[in-house]
């Protein structure tokens, strides 16, 4: 069964590397960060390299309203793994 992984801070650094590793393992990814352009580039890279299905959710996790929005949006998702990597 394919796992779903949500990674915050996915646009660079450790978060990006987590995304690459889980994509290589065949997981579906939910990528969250502030920069949509970086997330879109990463999603395309992972799709080309591994056929990975990525969902992009842009948000500034330092903002309480955006955290609430994400939680509400993902409340119906089945998450197997959560990587809380967003930095401030």
Predicted regions and their residues:
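Conserved NAD(P)H cofactor-binding loop of Rossmann-fold oxidoreductase domains
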Residues: 86-88
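Conserved glycine-rich Rossmann-like NAD(P)H-binding loop of the short-chain dehydrogenase/reductase
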Residues: 25-42
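N-terminal Rossmann-fold NAD(P) dinucleotide-binding loop
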Residues: 15-16
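Conserved hydrophobic beta-strands of the Rossmann-like cofactor-binding core
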Residues: 4-7, 82-83
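Conserved glycine-rich cofactor-binding loop
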Residues: 11-12
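Aromatic pocket-lining residues of Rossmann-like dinucleotide-binding sites
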Residues: 22
């Amino acid at each position: 069964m394919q796992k779903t992984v949500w990674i915050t801070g996915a646009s660079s650094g450790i978060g990006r590397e987590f995304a690459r590793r889980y994509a290589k393992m065949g997981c579906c990814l939910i990528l969250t960060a502030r920069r949509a352009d970086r997330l879109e580039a990463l999603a395309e890279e992972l799709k080309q390299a591994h056929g990975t299905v990525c969902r992009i959710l842009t948000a500034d996790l330092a903002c309480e309203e955006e955290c609430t929005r994400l939680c509400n949006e993902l409340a119906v998702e089945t998450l197997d793994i959560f990587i809380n990597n967003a930095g401030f």
